[in-house]
């Protein structure tokens, strides 16, 4: 198992193709839905709860696909994409820990938006604090997270939940 503590864009894309942690590990989305350019740090003993943390980044430029359609003459990154990135990172964490199966977002306790990501921004930073992981018949990760744009916190989410399933046909 790869226990590196940082990952570049090529490695994240490899995760989306099942080539980073193995063909049965949870996968990240690829292409436009991959909302992460790099994982700066990942560990299993840091963070607010001492159970792990992830810091990841997305470079922002005015040419990103969502600025052309959300909204015409009022471009802003959809808040749901930042939230999805947080779920992506919880699923990645479970794969990094060795979980096998297909990752699925299961919910979130509370989400707050107090700002926006505009085309003139330079960088989005995601900071996740792992609260709990379960590795039994049920594999699940729970985390709290914030999103910063150019160093200013604009989103927060509590109790982000991602499960990993061997069979999603009846989910």
Curated annotation (Swiss-Prot):
Its main location: cytoplasm. It comes from the Bacteria. The keyword Lipid metabolism applies. CDD domains: FabA. Keywords: Cytoplasm, Fatty acid biosynthesis, Fatty acid metabolism, Isomerase, Lipid biosynthesis, Lipid metabolism, Lyase. It catalyses: a (3R)-hydroxyacyl-[ACP] = a (2E)-enoyl-[ACP] + H2O; (3R)-hydroxydecanoyl-[ACP] = (2E)-decenoyl-[ACP] + H2O; (2E)-decenoyl-[ACP] = (3Z)-decenoyl-[ACP]. GO terms for biological process: unsaturated fatty acid biosynthetic process. Its EC number is 4.2.1.59, 5.3.3.14. GO terms for cellular component: cytoplasm. Homodimer. Belongs to the thioester dehydratase family. FabA subfamily. This is 3-hydroxydecanoyl-[acyl-carrier-protein] dehydratase. The gene is fabA.
